[in-house]
Amino acid sequence: MPNPLRLAYLVFEARKPARWERFMKDMLGLPAPAVHADGSTGWRVDGASQRLVVTPGPRDYLAAVGLECADEHELRQLVQRLQAAGHRAEQGDAALCSQRKVQHLWHVNDPEQGRVELCVGLAEAATPFASAAFPDGFETGALGLGHVVLVAQDLAAMEAFYGGLLGFGVTERLQTQVGPVHIRGTFMHCNQRHHSLALFDLPSSFRIHHFMLQARSLRDVGRAFERAESLGLPIDLDLGQHPEPDGTFSFYAETPSGFAFEIGAQTQAI
């Protein structure tokens, strides 16, 4: 397995980006974003220059998953492995790198045509991160940006791509029945975070099921839940604790695009 990757950023296309701006400010309490030439906005959740990017467009969907490599050598190795396996990996130009706030970037599609951006050198912001909504901040750093859960129609092919080619390890697997629907899932890690990526075979019109931000304190999670209720956001799952070995105490609610977000704390490292 290569040196640890980390989830660097997520890019969302939104039909109504103004709703996302209110969500980022009112729900997540994030500082004012950077505004790019194409109209996209880059939002901070820590010392990095941006972690969540919202770009205006005709669809509500996950436009890209950004994965940061340890260094340029690891990036080149991953690109070579992908190309040898028949995947078309293309280098991002200077304009895209500037937009993503990284030094170098290659992009490739996973087996279900989801865009993955492999990068190095995510820029740090000039000022410390501060949020009145999350005064204790979020757990990021070497663990990267929380996690993202993707909907996978072909779970085996997606596991082979993210595991066999990108080097994610399987933390645990899940099989459950929700009414008439049989759900299978695979939780995958690329560093000490329990999972930075999960793949779920379930009915959905979205590529993404949810993304998660890990708060540093339970107090901030509780206040976030109260804030979600006061803002009238649909609550998908009430406050509760995941079973071991994850152990996260969290809740799930809906983003302005209709897929979910999770705010949690006390996730166990592996």
Q: Model-found features: residue ranges?
A:
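N-terminal beta-strand motif that seeds the catalytic metal site of vicinal oxygen chelate
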Residues: M1-A18, L62-L67, A123-A156, G169-T171, ...
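Core segments of cupin and vicinal oxygen chelate
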Residues: P2-Q50, L150-H194
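Short, structured motif recognition centered on aromatic/hydrophobic residues
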Residues: R6-L10, M24, L30, L52-V54, ...
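Helix N-cap motif at beta-to-alpha junctions
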Residues: R15-P17, A70-E74, R216-D220, S257
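Conserved active-site tyrosine of GNAT-family acetyltransferases
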Residues: W20-K25, L82, Q113, M158, ...
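Conserved donor-binding loop and adjoining core beta-sheet/short helix segment
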Residues: A34-A37, T41, V45-A70, D93-A95
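A contiguous binding-surface segment within folded domains or other stable secondary-structure elements
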Residues: V79, H194-D246
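Vicinal oxygen chelate
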Residues: Q83-G141, R184-F187, L233-I270
